[in-house]
Structures are given as structure tokens and as C-alpha cells.
């Protein structure tokens, strides 16, 4: 890593402490994490990412996610920034020793740049005592987006998520359950 000419323009702060640096070539060094609430300043960007990331049958509006978050002590809604750019979000539910990722999305222009992997890494840091559980569209050979489903599964596997051997069906679709290592009950 090289020294930055003006680190104050590139430093990422969390509670007044520098937690990472985004260098001038826009290569990710770290992310700023914020809780998404009703006064979230980038609600339009959040909505845009949600619309781009999820097909209509899987889409849930950020306003509905906020309502659910506000009504539950076990629900968290996180936003991620690279520098000043809002790049993605996670919506999750905590239950016993498990965190279930309900929604995870990264903006189209930030995909395949390492941001998704960094967010998953930070998720494990946020919840070190929890097993992270998520579901993905099953790699059904007859699916019209089979290539996308395989790429998504491979992405999670590269990031340490393993198949549990369990599947869940909702919204008329079948999803494969993955978890962050270890056994799954």
C-alpha cells in the first residue's frame, strides 16, 4: 500500500476512528458500514440497487424492509459505502446463534470488483459468534438463468459458504441453503 497525498479525502471513519482507506484508483481497501434507518440519506440509491438486484417475484421494497426492521429487535439493516459512494446493503435476522441473510445486494457498477466479498467478510466481523446462513436460487438445470445461479453459488463458495444439503421453497421457487462453515442444524 502506498501513502496517500491527502489521506483525509480517502479515510473511512466509523465512530471517529479510521477503519479503512479507499485509494485514488478506486480499488477497495475497506468499507464504511452504516445502519439504515428512516433518515438514511441515500434512499434513492438503495431503491435503485434493490430494483436492479432482484427480479419482481423476489423484490421487497426498502421501505418494507425498514418497517420490518423497526418492528423487530432481531433484525438489522446495513448499508455499505466505498468512500462517498453507496454500494450495497444487507438485511438480516438474528436468531439464537444464527444470522439469516434475507437480502444482500451490491450495485451493478460495483459488482465483480471485490466489494461483495469484502461485505461478506465484514459481516463475519460484525457477528463473530453467529453462523451466517443464506439462501440462493437452486441451480436447476431448466432455469433460464442457470449460468447466473451457478456464478452466484460459486461466489459464495469462494467466500467460505458451504451447501447445507437443505432447500427451502417460497415465492414459487426453490432455494438452496448455504452457511458459513461448520455444521448446520
Where in this protein do the model-derived segments appear?
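C-terminal "cap" of GNAT-fold acetyltransferases
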Residues: 149-150, 165-185
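Short amphipathic alpha-helix that is part of the acyltransferase structural core
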Residues: 24-64, 181
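Conserved acetyl-CoA-binding loop of GNAT-fold acetyltransferases
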Residues: 152-164
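Conserved beta-strand in the GNAT
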Residues: 79, 85-93, 98-105
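Conserved acetyl-CoA-binding loop-helix of GNAT-fold acetyltransferases
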Residues: 106, 112-126
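Conserved GNAT acetyl-CoA-binding A-motif
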Residues: 127-148
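Active-site rim helix/loop that mediates acceptor-substrate recognition in acyltransferases
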Residues: 53-82
Amino acid at each position: 500500500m502506498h501513502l496517500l497525498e491527502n489521506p483525509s479525502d480517502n479515510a473511512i471513519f466509523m465512530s471517529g476512528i479510521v477503519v479503512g482507506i479507499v485509494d485514488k484508483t478506486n480499488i477497495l481497501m475497506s468499507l464504511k458500514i452504516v445502519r439504515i434507518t428512516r433518515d438514511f440519506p441515500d434512499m434513492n440509491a438503495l431503491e435503485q440497487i434493490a430494483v436492479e438486484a432482484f427480479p419482481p417475484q423476489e423484490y421487497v421494497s426498502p421501505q418494507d424492509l425498514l418497517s420490518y426492521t423497526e418492528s423487530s429487535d432481531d433484525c438489522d439493516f446495513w448499508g455499505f459505502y466505498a468512500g462517498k459512494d453507496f454500494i450495497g446493503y444487507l438485511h438480516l435476522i438474528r436468531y439464537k446463534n444464527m444470522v439469516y441473510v434475507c437480502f444482500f445486494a451490491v450495485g451493478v457498477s460495483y459488482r465483480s470488483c471485490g466489494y461483495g466479498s469484502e461485505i461478506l467478510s465484514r459481516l463475519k466481523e460484525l457477528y463473530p459468534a453467529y453462523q451466517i446462513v443464506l439462501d440462493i436460487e437452486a441451480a436447476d438445470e431448466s432455469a433460464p438463468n442457470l449460468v447466473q445461479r451457478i456464478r452466484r453459488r460459486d461466489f459464495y463458495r469462494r467466500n467460505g459458504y458451504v451447501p447445507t444439503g437443505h432447500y427451502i421453497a417460497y415465492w414459487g421457487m426453490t432455494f438452496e441453503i448455504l452457511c458459513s462453515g461448520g455444521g448446520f442444524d
